[in-house]
Regions:
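Bacterial N-terminal signal peptides that target proteins for export
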Residues: 2-15
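Hydrophobic alpha-helical transmembrane signal-anchor segments
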Residues: 13-24
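Sec-dependent signal peptide cleavage junction
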Residues: 22-36
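Short, intrinsically disordered, charge-balanced linker/junction segments flanking boundaries
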Residues: 30, 160-162, 169-174
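Acidic Gly/Asp/Thr-rich repetitive segments characteristic of extracellular carbohydrate-active
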Residues: 35-70, 75
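Extracellular beta-strand-rich solenoid/capping regions of secreted or surface-exposed proteins
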Residues: 75-92, 100-128, 133, 139-156
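A structural signal for beta-strand register positions
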Residues: 97-99, 130, 159-161, 166
Length: 174
């Protein structure tokens, strides 16, 4: 009977040890990060559920800021960022090694990922600051083209693919 109690105590101690180990692991390790982008301004980082929300917030800022992609942007949601004359922002888009695809059809009203309207003072710079420096940058795929007019668009590395199936593309601009 003494041997039996020792075996029961051993099993109980192993079980309690396993429970303690799992209870010490933070739950955030198991949580999926659903945020697509973050905005950094003056060393303050705010994460957003969508890239569109991040750009909407960044356009309102007067200080230079960085929109950083946190996960691949693929799917049916269309990113349509329009910079207007009221926008006086300086945004750096860090693709962070991810691809960005804007899936549009000819029937959709907003065929462009980024549109700069006449009179805007907005600046957009695209960079890749991922840890994997072998990758030059993300891939921007615009099935219906993109409009950049009266503005400056910088892209440091990566690939910009524009299919002319109804969009205006990049024309007569920097």
């Amino acid at each position: 009977m003494n041997t039996n109690m020792t075996l029961e105590k051993r099993i109980l101690s192993v079980l309690l040890t396993v429970i303690m180990v799992f209870s010490m692991v933070p739950l955030s390790v198991f949580a999926a990060d659903s945020n697509q982008a973050s905005v950094t301004v003056n060393e303050t980082v705010t994460e957003y559920a969508t890239i569109q929300e991040a750009f909407d917030a960044a356009k309102k800022l007067t200080d230079p800021c960085t929109v950083k992609v946190l996960q691949s942007f693929k799917g049916s949601m269309v990113l349509g960022v329009t910079f207007t004359a009221e926008d006086n922002c300086d945004i750096t888009l860090d693709v962070n090694g991810f691809d960005m695809y804007n899936r549009n059809t000819r029937d959709q009203a907003s065929a462009s990922m980024f549109t700069f309207e006449k009179g805007t003072n907005a600046h957009l710079t695209v960079v890749n600051n991922s840890e994997n420096r072998e990758t030059l940058g993300g891939i921007f795929y615009y099935p219906n083209g993109t409009d950049i007019s009266n503005s400056v668009f910088y892209m440091e590395g990566g690939t910009l693919t524009i299919e002319d199936v109804g969009g205006d593309g990049i024309k007569n601009k920097t």
